[in-house]
């Protein structure tokens, strides 16, 4: 009945953002962010495994509060995406070429993926010697709401005023056609069917 952010006392290493939709209209009528107590352990493990090869800060037993705060903000933003109806977009993780993910200029502008709804949370491609490359959300501006996310919210929420139902459908289709050849706007569901959905 009420949208909430909840801390759940549980051994689970997870967070999620479920929502309830009106089956007649698709309107989201209630949503939550569930933050399980041990999700910080999961964040620590991800950050260590994905960045420790090039990031001395990730090798410590405990992280600075500022680092953990950035990790929490990033995952909270991902879960918020679910509360407004965005599904996982695992196709986003293959949008950027490896050389771009090793570029400081590129990663500080675009992050690690064009969608926060992917699990490409940290720059696990960076190698020793990739000076200045962005490794985590605060390196490129947190949260990393990507170009795909902005596009998906526009497609799902932008009012199309003074249009008939058929005209509205055509406008929505035209927005899809405009981006269909751009990998930054590619969608890939989670489920392991498409090898380009890498996370």
Positions of PLM-derived features:
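Metzincin-family zinc-dependent endopeptidase catalytic domain
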Residues: 1-83, 111-112, 122-125
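Residue-level preference for alpha-helix termini and adjacent loops
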Residues: 20, 34, 89, 100, ...
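Poly-acidic low-complexity segments
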Residues: 22, 36-38, 89, 192-199
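Alpha-helix termini
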Residues: 39, 43, 91-94, 98
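Catalytic Zn2+-binding segment of zinc metalloproteases
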Residues: 80-96
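Conserved catalytic/binding loops enriched for acidic/polar residues
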Residues: 93-199
């Amino acid at each position: 009945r009420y949208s909430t952010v909840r801390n759940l006392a549980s051994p689970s290493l997870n967070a999620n953002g479920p929502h309830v939709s009106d089956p007649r209209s698709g309107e989201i009528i209630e949503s939550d962010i569930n933050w399980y107590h041990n999700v910080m352990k999961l964040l620590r493990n991800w950050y260590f495994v994905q960045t420790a090869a090039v990031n001395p800060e990730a090798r410590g037993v405990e992280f600075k509060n500022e680092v953990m705060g950035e990790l929490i903000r990033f995952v909270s933003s991902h879960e918020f995406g679910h509360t407004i109806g965005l599904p996982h977009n695992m196709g986003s993780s293959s949008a950027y070429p490896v050389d771009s993910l090793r570029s400081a200029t590129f990663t500080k502008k675009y992050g690690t993926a064009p969608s926060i709804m992917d699990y490409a949370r940290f720059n696990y491609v960076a190698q020793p010697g990739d000076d200045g490359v962005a490794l985590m959300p605060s390196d490129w501006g947190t949260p990393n709401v990507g170009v795909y996310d902005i596009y998906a919210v526009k497609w799902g929420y932008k009012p199309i005023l003074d249009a008939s139902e058929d005209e509205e459908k055509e406008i929505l289709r035209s927005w899809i056609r405009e981006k269909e050849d751009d990998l930054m706007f590619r969608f890939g569901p989670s489920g392991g069917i498409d090898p380009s959905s890498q996370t």
